Amino acid sequence: MTKITVVGAGSWGTALAMVLADNGHDVRIWGNRSELMDEINTKHENSRYLPGITLPSTIVAYSSLEEALVDVNVVLLVVPTKAYREVLQDMKKYVAGPTTWIHASKGIEPGTSKRISEVIEEEIPEDLIKDVVVLSGPSHAEEVGLRQATTVTSAAKRMEAAEEVQDLFMNSYFRVYTNPDIVGVELGGALKNIIALAAGITDGLGLGDNAKAALMTRGLTEIARLGRKMGGNPLTFAGLTGMGDLIVTCTSVHSRNWRAGNLLGKGHSLEEVLESMGMVVEGVRTTKAAHELAEKMEVEMPITAALYDVLFNGNNVKDAVGSLMGRVRKHEVEAIPDLL
């Protein structure tokens, strides 16, 4: 039995805490809403973020980060990307020794465009880091909460660390593969949110299956293009954290990013969409970060650029579709010649 603290009591953090508790681990979960932590402890439910799911009674919730981290050497971070530095700066005051830092957040840090593992390594002193591991893949919290079959990937620079995390999570309904490509796994999980927003827009506009299939396929090309430039393995983007996560996020009503895009496609403003969602839509911030990265690294990402103009420059969604369809003719695979 391993002592694990889950930092972040949203839908995904709560679902992963359930998986770990089902596996017999000593699981604590921290959140900044004391009434929500009280509900988890007394009613064994997170009615705000994962309603209708009865949580194992062994999960103990804390609103004090200091108390949640006592005698723990494995932490699972599941907080919005914009909150990472602030949370990590608090956490390092209370972590006593070398710790395995797992993160399951799919995004890029706003402002710096850095991957979350890079943020962890910048904020946490070396003597407090045993390993940094990423957990990512096609995984809606709602389905994991129902213990429906789910498969994800554990990635770390040190394969033994990825395998240790694999062992922590594996059970009859939650399968975990390993991958040494931490860059590709993080980028696949983050960048697919951009394409999911765009897929939601195509559905909101009623453009049909042909358009959506093309968008997802060309979107995956963009993800792989930037991922390769940043050091990711092209094969990673054909796996669970690339194609797999892209499919589930672009086609499911559980997807916040798809739902947000769908509302945009139906004519709602970004402000209206974000207000109505009530939860973080990482794809909005990730679009900005990826657009900045693409310009800096001179990587062609036309779908990302078109979505950026819709979100941040007020471009009309129909005009964005027209601009993509009217681009100069191209060879389909010219951008990824080493895959031929």
Curated annotation (Swiss-Prot):
Pfam families recorded: NAD_Gly3P_dh_C, NAD_Gly3P_dh_N
Q: Where in the cell is it found?
A: Cytoplasm
- The catalytic activity of this protein is classed by the Enzyme Commission as 1.1.1.94
Q: Give the highest taxon in the source lineage.
A: Bacteria
Q: What class of enzyme is it?
A: oxidoreductase
Write out the GO cellular component annotations. cytosol
Q: Which InterPro entries match?
A: 6-PGluconate_DH-like_C_sf, 6PGD_dom2, G3P_DH_NAD-dep, G3P_DH_NAD-dep_C, G3P_DH_NAD-dep_N, NAD(P)-bd_dom_sf
According to its UniProt entry, this protein's organism is: Bacillus cereus (strain AH187)
Instruction: List, from the UniProt record, the residues annotated as the active site of this protein.
Output: K192 (proton acceptor)
Q: Which UniProt keywords apply?
A: Cytoplasm, Lipid biosynthesis, Lipid metabolism, NAD, NADP, Nucleotide-binding, Oxidoreductase, Phospholipid biosynthesis, Phospholipid metabolism
What name is this protein filed under?
Answer: Glycerol-3-phosphate dehydrogenase [NAD(P)+]
Q: In which pathway does it act?
A: Membrane lipid metabolism; glycerophospholipid metabolism
Q: Where are the transmembrane segments?
A: none
